[in-house]
Design a protein with these regions (language model features):
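Short acidic capping loops at alpha-helix termini that bridge into adjacent secondary structure
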Residues: 91-97, 117-120, 167, 227-228
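Short, intrinsically disordered, charge-balanced linker/junction segments flanking boundaries
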Residues: 243-245
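Conserved coil-to-alpha-helix start sites within the AMP-binding
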Residues: 103-107, 127-131, 239
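Short beta->alpha connector loops at strand-helix junctions that form conserved
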Residues: 125, 144-148
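N-terminal small-domain helix-loop-helix segment of the aminotransferase-like
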Residues: 8-102, 109
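Active-site pre-lysine segment of PLP-dependent enzymes
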Residues: 18, 136, 143, 154-170, ...
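Conserved PLP-anchoring active-site segment centered on the Schiff-base-forming lysine
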Residues: 113-135
Length: 245
């Protein structure tokens, strides 16, 4: 079977191979040394809370398994809106919320909806490897901007300003970040957004690890900066539901 040129551009997701190798190593030494702590994949060691499991059982028993609204179940979107208000103090109307089959699907859909062929999207390097492929699938170009430990491996407003060009469409950020685990300082995130807004660009931010930070200053959603922020969140990490999609 001949694959598309688009598919040929996608690199393997190497972290899964690393995870398999680590699991094999853990099995080999099981019982002979201290248990291993896995730092290679973004997945909790425990499953979803009992209330979530019970809700899934009820849905199956009650026959709630048919097509839903394309934007997601309306009661679910309302509850997500309430959760943002309660947890983060942010007003996000349900009409702004779209439910997808996972955060990767949301990132891909956002890129397809907002990026045209030839558009450039700025993102830090290192960053989540799939992000550049989401942009590429939309016929855009990911512009990787090197970052350092001193910069928390995150972009700054100054770097965004310096890298912005005629073809730049916007930025794709992650806070907290995968794979580095670092967050963007609130003042810096605000400054980045101001630069992007002044350029007429878009700000997409991956917030699927939001709420898992031990530092209060990094526990706020970027959605508080304005209704032109596109935030991607997920049940996978905070609610321990990686395989539930």
């Amino acid at each position: 079977m001949k694959f598309s040129t688009r598919a040929e551009r996608i690199e393997p997701f190497y972290v899964m191979e690393v995870a398999k190798a680590a699991q094999a190593m853990a099995r080999e030494v099981a019982g002979t040394r201290e248990p291993m702590i896995f730092l290679n994949i973004g997945e909790p060691d425990f499953t979803a809370p009992p209330l979530v499991q019970q809700a899934a059982e009820r849905a199956i028993r009650d026959g709630l398994t048919q097509y839903t609204n394309a934007l997601g179940l309306e009661p679910l979107r309302e509850r997500i809106s309430d959760w943002y208000a309660t947890r983060f103090g942010v007003d996000v109307p349900a009409r702004r919320i779209v439910v997808t089959a996972g955060a990767s699907a949301a990132l891909q859909l956002a890129c397809l909806a907002l990026i045209d062929a030839g558009d450039e999207v700025l993102m830090p390097d290192p960053s989540y490897p799939c992000n550049r492929h989401f942009v590429s699938a939309a016929e855009g170009k990911a512009v990787l901007i090197p970052t350092t430990a001193e910069e928390r491996f995150q972009l700054s407003a100054a770097k965004v300003e310096a890298a912005w060009g005629e073809k730049t469409r916007g930025v794709l950020l992650a806070s907290p970040s995968n794979p580095t685990g670092t967050s963007i300082a609130p003042d810096e995130l605000r400054a980045i957004h101001q630069v992007v807004r002044a350029k007429g660009g878009l700000t997409i931010i991956d917030e699927i690890y939001l709420g898992l930070s031990y530092e209060e200053q990094y526990s706020h959603s970027a959605l508080a900066l304005g209704d032109d922020i596109i935030s991607i969140n997920s049940f996978s990490k905070y609610f321990n539901m990686t395989g539930w999609r």
